[in-house]
């Protein structure tokens, strides 16, 4: 058993309370490798932003759970080395799909876990979530639950269509499970293809897809039912067109990739939404940088020469999200 406190991590409880009160959101960036982690820590340390390091089940299998624990410990020390005296870093399991997986992460030093039982019938979702909460809270680990289903594909999480969270269920769900935060479905979705072309309109000037707006009416209803309760948005990458264009110009094929407009995420950040998940954007930044190097320098085979620019591009992206979208800069001095 490894306590996250020994590693220097924090849970989300105080972080979320401040974010809800302050009208900003905490960035939750998924990572799979060292370059992504370096970029996240550099951006967070420079902006003094609290940050959530997210690891999916697939990423945990890819990176190895033991290595992840030491990467998280290294991230805390690296942040201090960069001049961030009191780093506020969470290590969070994204989309845990079983009690066993969540328990294993708690035991390995994660400071926060998500149990995603949203695909189960309502009462089964409550029962499984409550079981995870009871175990995690013994070790002061915070728990995110999900109510409603997001469409799209992210690692091993897939759903054909979304089902909006039903506001009339949230009080009962939060009370009976004891969860610390709630991921809701209001129209975001996983992956770089968040909407089908038939769900969108097209910009007459550029021909690019314009996604439908998020269901802010559902969000506001949930806020009324659970005032001050931490709300989470998954699938909130914006799919920057410049990265899509670079990828496509350098041998890639991402037609009609479309994400959540940043102005809608800014609006969400000012509400009870205190955690916004971003994964696909960093994948796109990394892939765009790597493809460009390979296209410009086809003889290059030193990984540092293409992963270095990828890391720099991701750092730039993370800083932009922190400062210009979520407003979390300066909130962890």
Give the positions of each predicted feature.
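Generic N-terminal amphipathic, Lys/Arg-enriched alpha-helix
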Residues: 1-27, 300-301
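A short N-terminal beta->alpha junction/helix N-cap motif
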Residues: 3, 24-32, 59, 309
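Alpha/beta enzyme core
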Residues: 10-21, 34-59, 65-86, 95-230, ...
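Short catalytic-loop micro-motif centered on adjacent basic/acidic residues
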Residues: 26-30, 91-92, 114, 231-233, ...
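Shared catalytic-loop signature of beta/alpha-barrel
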Residues: 53, 60-64, 265, 274-292, ...
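Short catalytic/ligand-gating loop segments at beta-alpha or beta-beta junctions
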Residues: 233-239
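Extended, intrinsically disordered, low-complexity segments
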Residues: 289-333
């Amino acid at each position: 058993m490894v306590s996250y406190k020994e590693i220097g991590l924090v849970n989300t409880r105080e972080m979320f309370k401040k974010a809800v009160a302050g009208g900003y959101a905490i960035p939750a960036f998924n990572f799979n490798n060292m370059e992504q982690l370096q970029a996240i820590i550099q951006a967070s340390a420079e902006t003094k932003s609290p940050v959530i390091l997210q690891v999916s089940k697939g990423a945990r299998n890819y990176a190895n759970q033991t290595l992840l624990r030491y990467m998280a410990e290294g991230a805390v020390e690296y942040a201090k080395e960069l001049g961030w005296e009191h780093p506020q870093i969470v290590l969070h399991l994204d989309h845990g799909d079983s009690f066993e997986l969540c328990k294993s992460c708690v035991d390995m030093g994660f400071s926060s876990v998500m149990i995603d039982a949203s695909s189960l019938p309502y009462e089964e979702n409550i029962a499984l979530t409550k079981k995870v909460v009871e175990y995690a809270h013994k070790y002061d680990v915070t728990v995110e639950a999900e109510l409603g289903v997001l469409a799209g594909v992210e690692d091993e999480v897939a759903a054909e269509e979304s089902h909006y969270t039903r506001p009339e269920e949230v009080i009962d769900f939060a009370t009976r499970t004891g969860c610390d935060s709630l991921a809701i479905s209001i129209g975001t979705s996983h992956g770089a293809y968040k909407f089908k072309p038939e769900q969108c309109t097209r910009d007459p000037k550029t021909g690019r897809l314009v996604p439908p707006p998020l269901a802010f009416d559902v969000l506001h209803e949930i806020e009324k039912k659970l005032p001050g309760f931490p709300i989470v948005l998954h699938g909130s990458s914006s799919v920057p067109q410049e990265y899509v264009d670079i990828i496509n110009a350098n041998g890639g094929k991402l037609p009609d990739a479309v994400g959540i407009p940043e102005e809608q995420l800014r609006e969400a950040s000012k509400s009870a939404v205190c955690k916004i998940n971003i994964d696909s954007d960093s994948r796109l930044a990394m892939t765009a940088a790597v493809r460009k190097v390979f296209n410009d320098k086809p003889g290059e085979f030193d990984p540092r020469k293409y992963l270095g620019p990828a890391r720099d591009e991701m750092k730039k992206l993370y800083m932009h999200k922190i400062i210009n979208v979520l407003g979390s800069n300066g909130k962890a001095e």
